[in-house]
Amino acid sequence: MKPLFISATGTGVGKSYTTQKLLQSLHQSGRKPLALKPIETGANPTPEDALLHLQLMQKLQLDQGLSLEEICLERYKLPASPWVSAKKEGRCVDVDHLLRRLLEFQKRSDPLLIEGAGGLLVPLLKEYFMIDLAEALEAHMVLVISGKLGGINEALLSLEALQHRQMSYTLVLNLWEEEKRSFEEISAPYWKERPERLFRLDSELEELTQTLLSAI
């Protein structure tokens, strides 16, 4: 079973929230998923997103005794890209270690949810990006998009990167409350004409979950 890699068109779009909703939905469908945030920046000192995933897994009795250090394999203080944050600390992201550990977790997950940091082209190394990590894992991408003005452009740039690498993906719309009314007017008409299905996280979670299970 392939892992699900949760990315987004940018920071603050809703990757962590989407990961948590998918974790709950998969659990309700009888699966035993794990959710990791292998790299987190802005962790000064606690990786807050990873902690939320661990707490939810503990609540659902899915954590398998994992520690926060296993949920978040690399953490950095500066809220920036992993490459910049690691460089500031005189460190370097250990991609080989990340891949090795994630493949190990994949074997004990049903399925494994991996939350990325930022968007697809966030650098882990100078010439190695978040999308490269997902591709190396042969993951199915869950791309969370925004309903704000400008969201279409951001989404299409991310889709172009995925399609260039011939990676499989599913689109998920995470609407903040203040975006719901404007989305129907400024963005929904375009997405209705696209060939891809755009799943709304607030109303189509169960169908999204079954679609993702079929994809992996």
From Swiss-Prot:
Required co-factors: Mg(2+)
Biological process terms in GO annotation: biotin biosynthetic process
UniProt: substrate binding residues: T41
Gene3D superfamilies: P-loop containing nucleotide triphosphate hydrolases
UniProt entry tagged with the keyword Lyase: no
Residue sites binding ATP per the record: G12, V13, G14, K15, S16, Y17, E115, G116, A117, G118
Main subcellular localisation: cytoplasm
Entry binding sites for Mg(2+): S16, H53, E115
InterPro entries: DTB_synth_BioD, P-loop_NTPase
Keywords: ATP-binding, Biotin biosynthesis, Cytoplasm, Ligase, Magnesium, Metal-binding, Nucleotide-binding
Record's catalysed reaction(s): (7R,8S)-7,8-diammoniononanoate + CO2 + ATP = (4R,5S)-dethiobiotin + ADP + phosphate + 3 H(+)
Catalytic residues identified in the record: K37
Tree of life domain: Bacteria
EC number in record: 6.3.3.3
GO terms for cellular component: cytosol
Subcellular location: Cytoplasm
Record's function text: Catalyzes a mechanistically unusual reaction, the ATP-dependent insertion of CO2 between the N7 and N8 nitrogen atoms of 7,8-diaminopelargonic acid (DAPA, also called 7,8-diammoniononanoate) to form a ureido ring.
Name this protein carries in UniProt: ATP-dependent dethiobiotin synthetase BioD
Native species: Wolinella succinogenes (strain ATCC 29543 / DSM 1740 / CCUG 13145 / JCM 31913 / LMG 7466 / NCTC 11488 / FDC 602W) (Vibrio succinogenes)
Lineage: Bacteria, Pseudomonadati, Campylobacterota, Epsilonproteobacteria, Campylobacterales
Gene: bioD
